[in-house]
């Protein structure tokens, strides 16, 4: 039996493109099939008590994997999670998630079924939101990162980068501009604006999609060249598919049909999936952006810690001190 080529298993750029191709080979035919639904099946507005505490209980979709991986799989196999990098990543992302939820939750979402929650209000601009919103983001980030780490350190260990200090020493600085990510992000936002204006003909601006692209692209624009060689792309792709499966089940069959949360149409691109209770395409994109950004941030923090350099020097590069010989030549 022939062995896989070294390029297919070791070229980070090729692996990144393969992840995109894997996602596209599922998304494109699925999108074509869903587009054939010209007249969505009629839906009935359920009574308020149709799903008591539904949103609250559904958080188990994140909590159970966290418990199973964190308290069973990891200890059983003796996996050593880089705890400092893990919790620093979660802290950064959760703070960012809370800030976005505080400022934009009422702009992008609706919550018309309070009976599906504990009815505990959490602060947000424009009015309180269910406390479940903040728990949703916290457990979501932890679940995404824990799944990736478990796959990276155990299930797909063969594709792990074991020598982080060596990789870290190759980098003069972690902060490296990646123009391709910037161009791609601007192109996606431009396409969303054009679609909303010329195809969907719906009023408003695709603010939610713009925010998602920015959230996923900013880490890539800043750190992708540094993170690309150390990302376990197979672990990332499997994490992405697992999270997408969970989120689509969650939103398309439960959250949107039963009003746990909904979407402000003026802030959406205008591309809605009729077969999935009018779910906007942004609901599919959000966890792609979250998974991608989470992994990049985590790997960059691991590289920083492995470099054993101060924060400023690691991210911006140490300023070279001129030698006496160089100074003499200058004089």
Could you say what each language-model-derived stretch is?
Residues 2-331:
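Aromatic-rich, lipid-facing transmembrane alpha helices and their immediate juxtamembrane interface loops
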